[in-house]
């Protein structure tokens, strides 16, 4: 939140955060105290004589009125004064309409006369209520209210039974005694409300008195409330301090400040006052009138009228939408906007202005595609970039760059808009300011224009999921639209038909950092919603990729070269062509293999892959090239299409993301697009009308098919007319007919479509788009070529509209295909007018559906989000909401994040017992097999050792148990589960990395496998803790993964299938552990919002209405959005309630028995089995009028068992339908019994035999005997009889249940088609088998009764009515049911949502023990704070409630904090940072008085480029400041060669006075220091010297492009020809620096500490940069003491985590490897030789470990061919000792782990006074060097800088000759020969090249040309980029696999002799000349 203060917008003092918000009602005296208008506002006018009037409605004390004016209260101006409240004293109190209902509730709870609670507060019930409702005052009131409702008398003394006020006279004594309740004992009135008035009415108090009803005036209520005691207030749920009952009645009305009701000034007319002001004027007027009338003693009814009016005005000011009241209007007739309307609704204050605001620094324009951008870039128009600014703080490092921007001003781009001084003054650069204003100082802020590389947030509405707002890097481009990469359109759901998108430029570095680390596009590639990528390759690239990877694509050399030009990660090697003769040709697959990153392994299929191939004999051949195999990063076979490159789980992109990390995947996307699109330019892809034409035979076919279809339809119609059509079960005749017709027509369409497709050639362009998956489907093709097909509206054929026909052009009752919407033309042929009309009808329906659906799903999504917004993973790993209620104990029940899991198969679940044993049991009896798989010694061990055999048996037992467990968990045998760590792929990776030969026996001991897996599963911890509960929870969370682990890594499969070596197995275990730990959900993750988005987003894709799917046995279930709505609303009456009834035993298999149960369930009334009924007058039963009944009726009457005389002459004859009777298994007897049971003796019912021709029931009324007596009324009676009989008839037909359950109207019986409803059993062999059993499905539900039926399976039977399940089975059952129903809704249309999101929603809805609907009735009844509730719905009601009860909001949720502008406790806001004050002492001061800080000052040079990848390390981070001279600033820590983390900045010459005149800079300056291409901690991979990079490191550095083609920036001091201390080629030559003579041991080019491969090695310094003794202290791990090299601190920089040698988050070989740390990224020093966790000799990461694979991006010197212990590299060869006999890398003083190098070694202690790197102790190559050697003290004569042999000025050893002078013109770095005046020293002459034998500064033994160490030797040439740690694909061990030849002349930017100015001389040239 920003306060006032200086105009910078930030207030000077930091604002405290708001901890909680207390609600309450203001008391009248408080209102008066806070009011600024003493005496109240008395006048309705606003002004008087043109001045605002004191005491009027525009009182100047209330705030500023004119723009220029000041406030009379606080003297602030318009922006500063917040406004002040006034007040109006009301003449009579009035009700507050918001509290009216509360007022009534309280009134009903207290005595009308004595204001005591009607229930004694000692009543146990009250005590119970108080205990139960702690902290829920609202509940308390409700309960107390329920208790008091029944009481209609105020309880007197202790005699509770004292009903009538007999003891009233002694009431006074009662009060003094205080024994009982002490009430007055009088009758209580009922309180009623009418409009805004309350009435009290008494019902006859005593027998004689009448009811009396009086109007309750607000005064009276006020009096009653005033007498309520504080304790009783509390019982009533009020908080006496904040909200007493009498304050709910308005006596003093607050007048809002002027800023809340500003007047609008219209030109030329008076001010237009705000609605509120108008309202207040009305109130003041009527109030004054009322006061006058009262004082003048007016008539009562006048005053009553006035009070009523005042009441009305006060009410409508608060709420102008009161029911039953007229609206308060303005003169124009527009209703006024009341306070309530200001708050509520989407546009209201809360949702419109607090929860969501309009923001600055945003831009919006149309988007257009640009495939050449990277996926995380966004092209921004220059016009926008020049308008949006970013405030950058001036530091010594960026002052020159900013000064330059300021100089350019706002008119030129890039420039700046404002300078903000440190005192807050803002200088606007748009209006030419004084030049003196433009001077910058550190601490100022410059608002500079947006420039390349800035981080922005890009967003497209509707923002349905988190992938709709992602971070991009800016790329400024001409023209006026945002450009973005095509692959990013999928997550944004964007297309380029005119979509607009928004861009937000974050304004602080913190925000930037968060976006960069959390929200950048590459990090969002995989969505947690369904654990798959959301970005794939689309459109033309996808079409092209399919064409490109076909078998017959060959490229010539020229084309290959051309394509490689577009491959940014190319390592400079062209692969061997696939075809050599007659001319070299490369295949598309080969080129694609270059694009695939790393060592990816992947198997997919092409979209046209035939299903039967996988099992057939050709499964390895794949005749159609449809099986895609990528092995070790090479595309071996297969055509790529959407399946491998699209957004599916397990696609190439997905694997790349999981294995290689997001950054490499980003390059993968870009490279595919640039390379493939450029190939497509050569190849071409077009589509024309020709593609839509098939051959004539096909058209003939199509015609015939359609003709036949029409014929079939006519036949069906005729059948229906002739009544020959049998209705299918459960359908009417009409439905059956429609279904059949539909089927015929659809078959016709499909058939024609497929024949049309078959006719298309392989080269058809429609087809190629469909096959690749880029656009369209088979149906689209067939519609274009063959037939458009049937048009539907609401799932049926086009309905009749005009008098039994669809259009007037058809005859009536035409059911034929044409008339009902079958379009038989194709799009190519064109539609006839009627067809076109029907087609338009179908299309229009789709549009309407979409529009309606959008609104529905939008609201659903909002409710979901609001209900779960504050649910997050806390630091104890539980999932809780804002009020700390546990929702889940572990997120997703396994504690893992959704992005990092994949589908895997559980191997043990499916196979039969035999297969299981064969695959998993280690068979130690079969010796031959063992010998094949294990090495000899292991075989002996296994065969001879019983202990081992027992272990192996135990392992198998364990797996068998696992299998049993799995079969319980997955009873259906579905083995696909979502787990972290794809084990099979990891094993495959291991096989590739360790070059496992599957034909050789393995050296992996089976026991090692068993033990290893056991150990590993102990390490995979989700739940910490040792108590039984934690242990159980841990087991539950990791059970599936452990089972998967044990079954995949079992000894048998390890030996037989995988054949891993011991080494590989160790690697695998380490990898699994680190991958598993990376997959754990992060605390602070807002999983609630994530789940809501993940469910809401698929909902928008769902269909809205459910169509009746034709042919499904007519049983309809609601699906799609309506069903989702029912579920989350927990609707009591779902549209289609239904039970799925499973049966037991015999009845499940026997249709007859199933039918019995069906009859027992289905509700049958008499009507359902009745054919017809009739009423006859049949006075003589013996000879009935119905002749056909005569026979059997006589039988009855011959021997009547009833009184024939009582029988009524009226007869009800019911004829039953035999078919229905038998269908429902009913007999006549049963029916008659039911009737007799229902009506008893009042009816006589006789029936004929079940086998009779017609089934007849005859029913007569039995008259009672006395009716006979009253003869004279007989006629009436007889009339009665037949009417009565009518009633009985209708009652019997509808209401009488013959059998079944009332609620179940219909039951369907069928055999399940899908597996999930079949009964799955496990056979004896242990296989799964699905049996078809009869299942019943019902319309209507009655779970309780159905479950108790005989033969119903009570376990599997389910209901889809959630509420019913809750009532019958309880909360756990309903949770599972809800989850299943939700899953069913979502998966119905083929979407997949990860289980954790569904689970979270279900848990949110059920975790309170009752069902919480996701509506205002559920969400807003939780105990969350009022602010959260009011941001959802019912805004005003919630706030009123909160005020009345004095609630407080603890500010723990998300909404609350957003409303108050605070950081929400989510994500990075849910923890605090701890600052180590001790470490801050090591911080570095930056002297600001740096000489030469001009435009060409050193820092200007550095930051002249785009912000470097790191953005510059802030000086305070690094502790290198001992002994800094004023020039020290020049060596700012972040200035060094291209941003190496600890770059040359801390160079000795910084501390030495030698560099006194330093603008001159060190060669360590990479000419493009900040360029993205320079090696920096955040861009580990880019600086591969290869690729399209010029020797000067990176042509992509924006700053250098325009200014200096060769990479020299002319004004950069480093290249200033006269700069004395700089000579780009001088090895380390600074004539004045005594310590740096070229022979200084720390300099020899071969000195280990000077590894040319260290990233900071700048291309122009041929051998050594004077500023960095160990060549960039962070050079990832080479430089013997690297990590410990900091003069002041053992670990790099205590404050910068990324430099600490032990930093856990870095590893050079990253993705695939991490010895001890969960996540690595390559250039970290933690790989340094001294880092304890990784010593090159550490056994399991031995230098030969292939894991340092050729492409491992950052190859550090621990790589095999350079690891000191690596046998193949043999640095131990005597002639390698780099310049000193006792300094062989294996010598104790060097070995990286050697104690003498440890930073803590005594002579190296950081506290040693001036332990600068150039102090002699640090010269590793000096012969007598031994760090602990006492003789080596810095003052030792041997090393005195003035010692003749060392001093650069001494004639003996001036590198060139004594006459060399720093200013000598010949010493210009740009002079072509560049010789510092002496031939022997010209770096371009062979004699002095580091490879020349004569140059061996201190040690004759080490000639750089010595064979083992020739720098040009391909294995290790210090100059060869191939060996540079940053080169992405280089492995010294495999020169053959590597693709970069070290001798390639043009490419070795790091070569010492490679002087930029003489490109012709390359390291090997000079070598040859020697």
Curated annotation (Swiss-Prot):
Changing residue 1859 to S: Loss of methylation and dimethylation but no effect on phosphorylation. Highly decreases methylation and dimethylation. Decreases methylation but no effect on dimethylation. Residues 1546-1970 are annotated as: Disordered. The modification Phosphoserine is found at residues 27, 217, 1843, 1845, 1847, 1849-1850, 1857, 1861, 1864, 1868, 1875, 1878, 1882, 1896, 1899, 1906, 1913, 1917, 1920, 1927, 1931, 1934. Its main location: nucleus. Zn(2+) 2 binds at residues 111, 114, 154, 184. The modification Phosphotyrosine is found at residues 1860, 1867, 1874, 1881, 1909, 1916, 1923, 1930. The modification N-acetylmethionine is found at residue 1. The modification N6,N6-dimethyllysine is found at residues 1838, 1859, 1866, 1873, 1887, 1908, 1922, 1936. SMART domains: RPOLA_N. Mg(2+) 1 binds at residues 493, 495, 497, 499. Catalytic core component of RNA polymerase II (Pol II), a DNA-dependent RNA polymerase which synthesizes mRNA precursors and many functional non-coding RNAs using the four ribonucleoside triphosphates as substrates. Pol II-mediated transcription cycle proceeds through transcription initiation, transcription elongation and transcription termination stages. RNA-dependent RNA polymerase that catalyzes the extension of a non-coding RNA (ncRNA) at the 3'-end using the four ribonucleoside triphosphates as substrates. An internal ncRNA sequence near the 3'-end serves as a template in a single-round Pol II-mediated RNA polymerization reaction. May decrease the stability of ncRNAs that repress Pol II-mediated gene transcription. This is DNA-directed RNA polymerase II subunit RPB1. It comes from Mus musculus. The gene is Polr2a.
């Amino acid at each position: 939140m920003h306060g006032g203060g200086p105009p910078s917008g930030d207030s000077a003092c930091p604002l405290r955060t708001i901890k909680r918000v207390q609600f309450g009602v203001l008391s009248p005296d408080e209102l008066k105290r806070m009011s600024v208008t003493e005496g109240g506002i008395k006048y309705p006018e606003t002004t008087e004589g043109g001045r605002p009037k004191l005491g009027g409605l525009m009182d100047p004390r209330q705030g500023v009125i004119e723009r220029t004016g000041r406030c009379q209260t606080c003297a602030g101006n318009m922006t500063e004064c917040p406004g002040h409240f006034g007040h109006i004293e009301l003449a009579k109190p009035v009700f507050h309409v918001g509290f009216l209902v509360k007022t009534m509730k309280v009134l009903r709870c207290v005595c009308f006369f004595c204001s005591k609670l009607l229930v004694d507060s000692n009543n146990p019930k009250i005590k119970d209520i108080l205990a139960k409702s702690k902290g829920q005052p609202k509940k308390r009131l409700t309960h107390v209210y329920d208790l008091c409702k029944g009481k209609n008398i105020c309880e007197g003394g202790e005699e509770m039974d004292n009903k009538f006020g007999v003891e009233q006279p002694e009431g006074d004594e009662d009060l003094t005694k205080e024994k009982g309740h002490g009430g007055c004992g009088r009758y209580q009135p009922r309180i009623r409300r009418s409009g805004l008035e309350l009435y009290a009415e008494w019902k006859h108090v005593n027998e004689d008195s009448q009811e009396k009803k009086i109007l309750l005036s607000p005064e009276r209520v006020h009096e009653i409330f005033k007498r309520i005691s504080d304790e009783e207030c509390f019982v009533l749920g009020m908080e006496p301090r904040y909200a007493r009952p009498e304050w709910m009645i308005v006596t003093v009305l607050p007048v809002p400040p002027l800023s809340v009701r500003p007047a609008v000034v219209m030109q030329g007319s008076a001010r237009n006052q705000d609605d509120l002001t108008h309202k207040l004027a009305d109130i003041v007027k009527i109030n004054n009138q009322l006061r006058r009338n009262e004082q003048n003693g007016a008539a009562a009814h006048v005053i009553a009228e006035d009070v009523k009016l005042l009441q009305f005005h006060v009410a409508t000011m608060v709420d102008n939408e009161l029911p039953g009241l007229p609206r308060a209007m303005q003169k124009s007739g527009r209703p006024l906007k009341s306070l309530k309307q200001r708050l509520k609704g989407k546009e209201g204050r809360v949702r419109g202005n607090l929860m969501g605001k309009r923001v600055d620094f945003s831009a919006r324009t149309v988007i257009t595609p640009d495939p050449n951008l990277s996926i995380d870039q966004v092209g921004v128009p220059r016009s926008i970039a020049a308008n949006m600014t970013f405030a950058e703080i001036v530091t010594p490092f960026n002052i020159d760059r900013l000064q330059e921007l300021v100089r350019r001003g706002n008119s030129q781009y890039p420039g700046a808009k404002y300078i903000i001084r440190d005192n807050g003054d803002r200088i606007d650069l748009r209006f030419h300011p004084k030049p003196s204003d433009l001077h910058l100082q550190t601490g100022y802020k410059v608002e500079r224009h947006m420039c390349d590389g800035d981080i922005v947030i890009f967003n497209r509405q509707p923002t349905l999921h988190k992938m709709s707002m992602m971070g991009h890097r800016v790329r400024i481009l001409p023209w006026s639209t945002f450009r973005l990469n095509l692959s990013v359109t999928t997550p944004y759901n964007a297309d380029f038909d005119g979509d607009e998108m928004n861009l937000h430029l974050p304004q602080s570095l913190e925000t930037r950092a968060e976006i960069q680390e959390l929200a950048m596009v590459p990090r969002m590639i995989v969505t947690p919603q369904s654990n798959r990528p959301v970005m794939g390759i689309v459109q033309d690239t996808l079409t092209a990729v399919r064409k490109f990877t076909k078998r017959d694509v060959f490229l010539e050399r020229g084309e290959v070269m051309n394509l490689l030009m577009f491959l940014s990660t190319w390592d400079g090697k062209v692969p061997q062509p696939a075809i050599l003769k007659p001319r070299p040709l490369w295949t598309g697959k080969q080129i694609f293999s270059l694009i695939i990153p790393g060592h990816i392994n992947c198997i997919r299929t092409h979209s046209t892959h035939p299903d039967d191939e996988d099992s057939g004999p050709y499964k390895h051949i794949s005749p159609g090239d449809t099986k895609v195999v990528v092995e070790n990063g090479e595309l071996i076979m297969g055509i790529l299409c959407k399946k491998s490159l699209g957004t599916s789980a397990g696609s190439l992109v997905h694997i790349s993301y999981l294995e290689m990390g997001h950054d490499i995947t980003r390059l993968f996307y870009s490279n595919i697009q640039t390379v493939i699109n450029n190939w497509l330019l050569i190849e071409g892809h077009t589509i024309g009308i020709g593609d839509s034409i098939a051959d004539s035979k096909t058209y003939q076919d199509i015609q015939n098919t359609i003709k036949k279809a029409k014929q079939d339809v006519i036949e069906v119609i005729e059948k229906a007319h002739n009544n020959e059509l049998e209705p299918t079960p459960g359908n009417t005749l009409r439905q059956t007919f429609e279904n059949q017709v539909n089927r015929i027509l659809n078959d016709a369409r499909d058939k024609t479509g497929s024949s049309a497709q078959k006719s298309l050639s392989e080269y058809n362009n429609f087809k190629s788009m469909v096959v690749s998956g880029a656009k369209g489907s088979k149906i689209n093709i067939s519609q274009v070529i063959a037939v458009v097909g049937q048009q539907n509206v609401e799932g049926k054929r086009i309905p009749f509209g005009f008098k039994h026909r669809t259009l007037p052009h058809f005859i009536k009752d035409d059911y034929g295909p044409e008339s009902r919407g079958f379009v038989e033309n194709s799009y190519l042929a064109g539609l006839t007018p009627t067809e076109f009309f029907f087609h338009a009808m179908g299309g229009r329906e789709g549009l309407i559906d979409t529009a309606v659906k959008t609104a529905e799903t939008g609201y659903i999504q909002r409710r979901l989000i609001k209900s779960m917004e504050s649910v997050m993973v806390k630091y104890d790993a539980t999932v809780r909401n804002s009020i700390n209620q546990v929702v889940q104990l572990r997120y997703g029940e396994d504690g893992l994040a959704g992005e990092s899991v994949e589908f895997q198969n559980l191997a043990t679940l499916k196979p039969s017992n035999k297969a299981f044993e064969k695959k998993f049991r280690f068979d130690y009896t079969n010796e031959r097999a063992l010998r094949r798989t294990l090495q000899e010694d292991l075989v002996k061990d296994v065969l001879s050792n019983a202990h081992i055999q027992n272990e192996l048996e135990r392992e198998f037992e364990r797996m068998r148990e696992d299998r049993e467990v799995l079969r319980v968990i997955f009873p259906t045998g579905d083995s696909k589960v979502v787990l972290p760590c794809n084990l099979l792929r990891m094993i495959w990776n291991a096989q590739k990395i360790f070059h496992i030969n599957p034909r050789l026996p393995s050296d992996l001991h089976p026991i090692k496998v068993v033990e290893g897996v056991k150990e590993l599963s102990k390490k995979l911890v989700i739940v910490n803790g040792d108590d039984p509960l934690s242990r159980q929870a841990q087991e539950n969370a990791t059970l599936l993964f452990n089972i998967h682990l044990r079954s995949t890594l079992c000894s048998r499969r390890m030996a037989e299938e995988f054949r891993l070596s011991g080494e590989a197995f160790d690697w695998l275990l380490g990898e699994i552990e680190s991958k598993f730990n990376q997959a754990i959900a992060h605390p602070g993750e807002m999983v609630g919002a994530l789940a809501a988005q993940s469910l809401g987003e698929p909902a928008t894709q769902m269909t809205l209405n459910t169509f009746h799917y034709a042919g499904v046995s007519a049983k309809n279930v609601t699906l799609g959005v309506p069903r989702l709505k029912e579920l989350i609303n927990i609707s009591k009456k779902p549209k289609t309630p239904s039970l799925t009834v499973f049966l037991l035993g015999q009845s499940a298999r026997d249709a007859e028995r199933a039918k019995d149960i069906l009859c027992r369930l289905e509700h049958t009334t008499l009507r359902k089995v009745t054919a017809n009924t009739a009423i006859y007058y049949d006075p003589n039963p013996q000879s009935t009028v119905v002749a056909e009944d005569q026979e059997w009726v006589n039988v009855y009457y011959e021997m009547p068992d009833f009184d024939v005389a009582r029988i009524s002459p009226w007869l009800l004859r019911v004829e039953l339908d035999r078919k229905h009777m038998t269908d429902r298994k009913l007999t006549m007897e049963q029916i008659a019994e039911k009737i007799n049971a229902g009506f008893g003796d009042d009816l006589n019912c006789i029936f004929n035999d079940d086998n009779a021709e017609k089934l007849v029931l005859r029913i007569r009324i039995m008259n009672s005997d006395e009716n006979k007596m009253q003869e004279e009324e007989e006629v009436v009676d007889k009339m009665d009889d037949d009417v009565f009989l009518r009633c009985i008839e209708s009652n019997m037909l509808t209401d009488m249940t013959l059998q079944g359950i009332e609620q179940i109207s219909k039951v369907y019986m069928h055999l399940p088609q899908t597996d999930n409803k079949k009964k799955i059993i496990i056979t004896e062999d242990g296989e799964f088998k699905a049996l078809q059993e009869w299942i019943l499905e019902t319309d209507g539900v009655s779970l309780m009764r159905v479950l108790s039926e005989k033969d119903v399976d009570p376990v599997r039977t389910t209901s889809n009515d959630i509420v019913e399940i809750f009532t019958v089975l309880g909360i756990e059952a309903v949770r599972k049911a809800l989850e299943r129903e939700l899953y069913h809704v979502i998966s119905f249309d083929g979407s997949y949502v990860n289980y954790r999101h569904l689970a979270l929603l279900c848990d949110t809805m059920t975790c309170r023990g009752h069902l919480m609907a996701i509506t205002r009735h559920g969400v807003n009844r939780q105990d969350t704070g009022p602010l959260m509730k009011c941001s959802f719905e019912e805004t005003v009601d919630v706030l009123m409630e909160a005020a009345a009860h004095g609630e407080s909001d603890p500010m723990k949720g998300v909404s609350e904090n957003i409303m108050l502008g605070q950081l929400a406790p989510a994500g990075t806001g849910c923890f605090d940072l701890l600052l180590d004050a001790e470490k801050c002492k090591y911080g570095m001061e930056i002297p600001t008085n740096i000489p030469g800080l001009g435009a060409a000052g050193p820092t200007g040079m550095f930051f002249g480029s785009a912000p470097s990848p790191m953005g510059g390390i802030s000086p305070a981070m690094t502790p290198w400041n001992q002994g800094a001279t004023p020039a020290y600033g020049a060596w700012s820590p972040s200035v060094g060669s291209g941003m190496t983390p600890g770059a040359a900045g801390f160079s000795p010459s910084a501390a030495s006075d030698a560099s006194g005149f330093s603008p001159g800079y060190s060669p360590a300056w990479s000419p493009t220091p900040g360029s993205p291409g320079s090696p920096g901690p955040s861009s580990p991979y880019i600086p591969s010297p290869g690729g399209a990079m010029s020797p000067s490191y990176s042509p992509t550095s924006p700053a250098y492009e325009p200014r200096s083609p060769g990479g020299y920036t002319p004004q950069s001091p480093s290249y200033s020809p006269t700069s004395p201390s700089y000579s780009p080629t001088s090895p380390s030559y600074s004539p004045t620096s005594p310590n740096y003579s070229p022979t200084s041991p720390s300099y020899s080019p071969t000195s280990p500490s000077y590894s040319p491969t260290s990233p900071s090695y700048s291309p122009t310094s041929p051998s050594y940069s004077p500023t960095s003794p160990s060549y960039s202290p962070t050079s990832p791990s080479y430089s013997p003491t690297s990590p410990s090299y900091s003069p002041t601190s053992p670990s790099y920089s205590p404050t910068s985590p990324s430099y600490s040698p032990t930093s856990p988050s870095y590893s050079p070989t990253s993705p695939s490897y991490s010895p001890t740390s969960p996540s690595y990224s390559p250039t970290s020093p933690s790989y340094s030789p001294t880092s304890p966790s990784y010593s090159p000799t550490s056994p399991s990461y031995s230098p030969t470990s292939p894991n340092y694979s050729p492409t491992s991006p950052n190859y550090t010197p621990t790589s095999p061919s350079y690891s000191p212990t690596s046998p193949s590299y043999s640095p131990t060869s005597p002639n390698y000792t780099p310049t000193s006999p006792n300094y062989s890398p294996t010598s104790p003083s060097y070995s990286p782990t050697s104690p003498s190098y440890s930073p803590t070694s005594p002579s190296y202690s950081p506290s040693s006074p001036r332990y600068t790197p150039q102090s002699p102790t640090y010269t590793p190559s000096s012969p007598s060097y031994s760090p602990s050697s006492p003789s080596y003290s810095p003052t030792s004569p041997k090393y005195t800088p003035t010692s003749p042999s060392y001093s650069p000025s001494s004639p003996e050893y001036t590198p060139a000759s004594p006459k060399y002078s720093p200013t000598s013109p010949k010493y210009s770095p740009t002079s072509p020969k560049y010789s510092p005046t002496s031939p022997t020293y010209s770096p371009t002459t062979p004699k002095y090249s580091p490879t020349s034998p004569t140059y061996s500064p201190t040690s004759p033994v080490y000639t750089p040309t010595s064979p083992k160490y020739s720098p040009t030797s391909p294995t290790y040439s210090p100059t060869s980029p191939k060996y540079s740690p940053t080169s992405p694909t280089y492995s010294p061990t495999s020169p053959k696999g590597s693709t970069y030849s070290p001798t390639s002349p043009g490419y070795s930017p790091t070569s010492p002799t490679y002087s930029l100015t003489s490109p012709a001389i390359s390291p090997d040239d000079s070598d040859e000349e020697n």
